[in-house]
Amino acid sequence: MNTIKKIVLTGGPCAGKTTALVKVIEHFSSLGYKVFTIPEVPTMFTQAGMNYLTSNKDFFYVGEKATLLTQLHLEDSFYKMAQTLEQPVLIVCDRGVMDISAYLSPQQWQDIIGEVGYTQAQLRDERYDAILHLVSAADGAEQFYTTSNNAQRLEKADEKGLQIARELDKRVIEAWTGHPHLRVINNHEDFDNKLNRVLKEISNVLGIPQPIEEERKYIVKLTGNVPNSIDSDIVQTYLAGEPNCEIRLRKRRFEEKEVFVHTTKKRISDTEQIETERQISSNLYESLLQQADPYRQTIKKHRKSFIWKGQYFELDSFESPINDLMILETKGIAKQESVKFPPFIQVAEDITGNTKYYNYNIALKK
């Protein structure tokens, strides 16, 4: 049976999805994949006459429900088509089902998915192999923000429109938070870096060996409140494994919900590794804990995830086995690019590449 992977490209307005889709099709088709792209359903509906800003509540509700049903039908239809092929298939969705929830009240969303016969967990956590969120140009790359590439866009290129776009960016990230393979793609000084990060993240999902890259990490102190952060509690356990292979179990708690993820990082050379990640059930999680590495302790930490000037940050406050360490990490920033530190962060030390501060080594029993 062929391999089928389904990912979502999402993000705020003017994030670069259209250009990224073209790159994805070209790149992975050249590697032998059949690439299907599911079009953005709300844009299709708007072009057909749907008005998402209507004051008619019944029309709005029925329209949003129809949008969801169409999205589900398109995805399921192309998945069935993919199953008939022998070559590996990559299905790329221009936005996914949870994007719809970002434009609804929580109660409206629960009512609609209840009528359709789905749960939040089924739609967010189980339908897709990865979610790639491209940060809007309205946050940190305002000079590139435009509405000319989508006539249906309502967020105009003025200060009010930019603020609306930033707020939508945040709501879309919140809608997908909890998915085990959510990746936020920063804005970059060079747009090609942003596109290359998309290709790298998809390659990881497909199990294609990737160059080993050091993410930028810093020991920091928090000097103020973190605005618009998404908070979660993480319990991380390392399992016993073969040499050059790191196996990690993670339980992440977010808004009273728990997600369990199994991750394997296998180094195949001095410069390349293969990383695989999958969501698992709570029962399998409990069972796999029996294979915990006896030489390592469980890590517990509180994470604040946030975007600042187009760059995505994760701020981890460690609670166990140490409780006086705070590490700030930002992903996908090229070496020649500068990190845009927020004013509420005080940097004590740059620890990029310092193996002492790898979680895997922090967990070592002393």
List each language-model region with its residue ranges.
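Phosphate-end processing signature that detects enzymes handling 5′-triphosphorylated RNA
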Residues: 126, 184-187, 192-366
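Hydrophobic anchor at the beta1->P-loop junction of P-loop NTPases
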Residues: 7-9
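Conserved substrate/cofactor phosphate-moiety recognition/catalytic segment
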Residues: 25-70
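Conserved lysine of the Walker
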Residues: 17
